[in-house]
Amino acid sequence: MAVQQNKKSRSARDMRRSHDALESNALSVEKSTGEVHLRHHVSPDGFYRGRKVVDKGSDE
């Protein structure tokens, strides 16, 4: 097993963890329907940037 040679200080430990915070997802509101979706993704009702790009009934 790996064993540290010297104790890490609280400062060094916390500086290492400074990038571990969770970030929230980037959400967008669809222009035409007002529905919320992930950025650069088609909204659940098939719209993207104000245009209908996917028919809800199709299996594609």
Curated annotation (Swiss-Prot):
Record field: compositional bias (Basic and acidic residues): 11-22
Top-level taxon in the UniProt lineage: Bacteria
Region (Disordered): 1-60
Record bears the keyword Ribosomal protein: yes
SUPFAM superfamilies on file: Zn-binding ribosomal proteins
Any Pfam family the entry gives: Ribosomal_L32p
Gene Ontology molecular-function annotations: structural constituent of ribosome
Record's keyword terms, sorted: Ribonucleoprotein, Ribosomal protein
Gene Ontology terms: biological process: translation
Gene Ontology cellular-component terms listed: cytosolic large ribosomal subunit
NCBIfam families to which the protein is assigned, alphabetical: rpmF_bact
Family classification: Belongs to the bacterial ribosomal protein bL32 family.
Protein name: Large ribosomal subunit protein bL32
Gene that encodes it: rpmF
